[in-house]
Amino acid sequence: MKSPSILVLSWVLVAALLLCCAGIAAAQQTAAPASAAPSRDAQSGAPATLPVLRLTLEDALARARKNSAQFQSSQTDAAIARQDRYQAAAALLPSVTYNNEALYTQLDRSGNVRLIANNAAQEYISQANVHESIDLVSISAFRRSSAASALAKARAEIASRGLVVTVVQSYYAVAAAQQKLEAAKKNGEEGDRFLKLTQDLEKGGEVAHSDVIKAELQMQDRRRQLLEAQLGLLNARLDFAVLIFSDFNDNFELAEDLHASVPLPTIAEVQQRAARDNPDLRAALAAVQQAGHDVTGARGGYLPSLSFDYWYGIDAPQFAVNGSNGSNLGSSAVATVNIPIWNWGATQSRVKQAELRRTQAQRELSLAQRRLVAEIQSLYAEADTALNELSGLSRSAELSAEGLRLTTLRYKGGEATVLEVVDAQTTFAQANAAYQDGAVRYRVALANLQTLTGVLTTP
């Protein structure tokens, strides 16, 4: 039989062991979140990768319009003109007002009559009034505001013309810079290969050291051209980003191919559509219509005007529907015809003034028509020339690439000189750059032509 002291000591040891195990477990649980916290912090601190924004030309134009203060100003003017038209239309419709008045008149106890228009010492008026006025001036004002709204809309499209051409040129300049960078990389690789080739041939005693020097100079020139192409692409992307993004963003790519086949419409199609949708022509025509309505409105000053008023409510000594002698409610109606007689020639002056404006608007319309015909021929010739040259430039780029390959092979066989290879490399670089510039020229010329027909200027 164990002694009581041994039993007590055993229980103390067991309790101590349990306490130690519990402390270790608690320490492990505390350390686990602490070790997990830096992981979460690291994950939260890592910047999220935004998806690359693919931009079509229409997307770029829409974004540029939102960021252009000049275009937004013209849009605001067009919106204001639409509200003017709404207000002019509302002026032709009956209006309803509700009048409330309280009048106090001091009575004359001597019997003299004064303030005869007042009906009693205390008079209360609470009436609804329906008013309608009809005259030629108001009708002409509505028609004028309609023409002014069309004029403001056309001017908004005119304001966007320069913006459209700028965006198109910047958009395809980025595409051309990308193509030039790819060509510069190929030229750089070709320069490195040619330098390696001349070095190998020099070791074999087949060429002189001067060929190696010439190849190395050419290689250094190609590397400088590669750096310039990288800088050109960077500047083109920055200029384009400033133009279309409200907050600077360089994380984008172009969705349209610079060398995609875009047919040129016939000149008859361009002329037909320009006659119908050209913003300058529509603006000039709307200005003539507006001036014509001004003349009609000014001549309306010679004619009578008609107004009609209808009242319903109370006009009584008590502010109540029912008075001491019955109902205070009543109604009345008034029709008025105002006939102009004499105003010292002011109406004649306004008519003359409006006719002068109409004559000037007609002159500007004739000028816009002649200018449109000239611009169509000029811009169409520009686009047609650029398109015809583009096929030749494409062929030149292909031939220069093939010529470079063949010249390099001839140099390997000892049939060509190093100068011929260098000349072939230079020709290839120039032909490729000219091809990219020609593609941009055609796109810009086509955009200029499309602005005449309202294709790209209409949001």
Per-segment meaning from a language model:
Residues A62-Q72, A79-S95, A128-R144, A154-R161, ...:
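A glycine-/polar-enriched beta->alpha junction
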Residues A90, D221-F248, A397-V455:
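Short segments within alpha-helical structural elements
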Residues K2, L13-L19, A26-S35, T49, ...:
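Acidic, low-complexity, intrinsically disordered peripheral segments
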Residues K2-S3, G162-A275, E382, A386, ...:
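Periplasmic alpha-helical coiled-coil/stalk elements that build and connect Gram-negative outer-membrane
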Residues E123-I125, Q169, K214, G330-S332, ...:
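Transmembrane beta-barrel architecture of outer-membrane proteins
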Residues A42-L53, N99-I134, E253-I267, T296, ...:
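Small/polar, glycine/serine/threonine/aspartate-rich low-complexity segments that form flexible
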Residues A27-E101, L107, L254-Q289, P340-I341, ...:
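Bacterial Sec-pathway N-terminal export signals of envelope proteins
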